[in-house]
Amino acid sequence: MSQLYALNGQPLAGKSDDLANKLAAFGLSQPNHSSLSEQQSTNSLLHGSGAFNKPPLSRNSTTNPLNLLYTQTQQPARSTTPFLLNPVGSSPGKLPVPSRNNSYLQGTAESNSGNFANNSISNNCWNSAYNSNSFEGTGSSPNFPPQNQFLSDSRSSIATLNAIPSLDQSVLLNPNLRARTPSLVPEHYFDDTDKSVHSKSSSGSNSLSEASNDDLESSIIQIVGGLPDDFDDRELSGIFTFCEGYDFSKIESENGHRKAIVYFRNAIAALKAKNMLNASSTNNFTIIQRDVVRQQENEYHKGIPPLTTPSLYSQRLSNNYDSTTPGFPRFSPANFDSVINKDVTSESRMSTSYPAVLEAFKSFNPIKAPKAEYLNQSRASMGNPSPSNWNNRLLQPSSKEQAVYSFQTQKNSKGLQFTSNELTNPTAKYSQLPNNIANIGESNSLSNQPNNFAQTSFDYQPNHPNAISPKAKFSLPSRPSYHKDNSFISKQAIDKSNPFEEALRLERTSPVKELPAIRPRTIPLNGVAPYESELRPPPKWKPMPDLKVVRSRPSLKQRPLRSAEYVRVCELKCLQEEEFDNKVLLEQVESNVQTDHNSPCNTIYVGNLSNPDQEKKLRLAFSKEKGYRRLCFKIKGNSPMCFVEFEEVCHAAKAMEKMQGAALDDKIKGGIRLSYSKNPLGVRSTENLSTTASLFQQHGPPKKSTDCYSAKASAAVERKYHFQNMTPKPNGTNSVTTLNRTQTHSSEVNDLFDIFEFPSK
């Protein structure tokens, strides 16, 4: 207590026999009560040390002093003034209201003689501003002290500001007690954030902010207007980087409307940042301090699980949230009573805020009692579920609880007595597990009864070994004995009406006695390469064509065979085409013979060449012609010479007609000039040429190159050359050697080599 007085700047007052003098000296205001019994019960609340004598024994006890001081049904609406103005204590309550003559601040305690039980409390300890007819700012205006009376310390302006905006102080408890004793009474008794009991003042008495209490307690601010189109998350975080308590921010877009959401560690930091931006002259943002959704805030504060009904649970989370340890809730059996009582008023707000959620919540009926009876029952009848009286409350319910929650006490076949509650444990009928397979039928028959359930999680009596409780370990059913004959041994006879036992009977009579053990495949050292073929998808299935369908298609039927007459006609047509081509070729050759002095042959002479480096270009140009055989390029003096040999004379004639005047280089004017060679390539005698020309005129142009060689051979025979038919090369070489020994001219032997060319290896 001495530390509390040191925090408030008050000297420790001496002990006094009169409790009223103590209250006046300590600065505790006491309101006027209407009943004498309540004053007498309050007389035993405090002793000389200023602490509480007795803790609350039970919630429903009429002699409990806390029931008189902290009545749940008379909780006033919390003031919208930010709780950051409270310099004393940890509870976000109101500041002490000064008395009429400020005697407790000046150290002079004036009180009438009399005792506390006779309701003789000094009027100096009561603020006259609370003598109005209403506590919500409606009705007659309150009476405030004259303006010439001032407080003697620095808290005067704050206390006066606290008294002016709203008159929501509790009638039964002075704010001084709330500010001076934060550790003696649980903090949830001081929490008066439930605004549903008393509506807000219709005159709008909040002078600091027009936001609601939930908005001021929110750690999230939203910028709903004034955001430029090119405003991104990086620029948004740059605005709040140096703000105290800033966590993170983001920009969201809903239906084309962009808004920014900024998260802070607490509501004070969010309020400071909001006020700082509003005070800026360059600020064009529309800022509100409000949660996006209560469930998002639950996810933001780590440690608080998300809830499905925000209206029912958001208020109790804010009331039971521990400000000393951010991010962790503070639930206990001591404050569970206040949470339950506030749910009654939360449902009324939920019907207006979330009508669809309320209808969905009402449609969920886990019990068999009428739905209206459950919803109309007061939550306070559930009691204070402290660990010391949980079992007593459940085993001895009230009349309403017995009618609604329908506790059932049954005995199973083994004579074990258990208690069930379908509301607290909706899955109780499935929580009983059999010990072995033989008892499956027994457990099913027990669970099929309408009013027979297993043991609940609130019953801690270990009389049922298979019951599942919150602190008990989950026990699996014992495994039945298994033998080599693939049969299970049970103590009772198998019931064929039970599907489980029928399956066991079929398994026992199955011809398969033992199945081979399944061994896992080991992965080889080279990885999954051997299984690559198995991992490939199967090829696409293509159906085989039906032979009957294929044969029935007219396009695939066998074509008729050609007749002999048709073949003869085709052969005659081909011969006529060849004769026509030969006639055309003969006319071309005759015209060339008339213009050219040399007789036509299969060798073409290429003239008008000035550059000796044109051999590659000539080979590339003539190699594309049909019947090309070889090219001979020679240089005599300064002028190059080129001969091109073809397989047949007709090919040479076509090539000469096509390539006549072709320009291989820009330096040569007129292009190349083509003419028949005097001698075929390799033939040097002029006599042979005359003989070949005479044969050509007699028999017509040859069709193949072999005809040219046959003409040369016949000319040689006329000159009485010696011919021998020799197939192997050595025999031909020996014959040539023998011929050289004879009296023949060397020119004649060279002609033989030109006619008979031996293949080289």
Swiss-Prot record:
Residue ranges with Basic and acidic residues bias: 188-197
SMART domains: RRM (SM00360)
GO molecular function, one term: mRNA binding
All residue ranges annotated as the RRM domain in the record: 223-289, 602-679
Protein name: RNA-binding protein mde7
PANTHER family for the chain: U1 SMALL NUCLEAR RIBONUCLEOPROTEIN A/U2 SMALL NUCLEAR RIBONUCLEOPROTEIN B
One example of a Gene Ontology biological process annotation: RNA splicing
GO cellular component, one term: cytoplasm
Annotated stretches, region: Disordered: 31-110, 188-213, 442-468
Coiled coil segments of this chain: none
Other information: Transcription is induced by mei4 transcription factor.
Keyword Repeat applies: yes
Species classification: Eukaryota, Fungi, Dikarya, Ascomycota, Taphrinomycotina
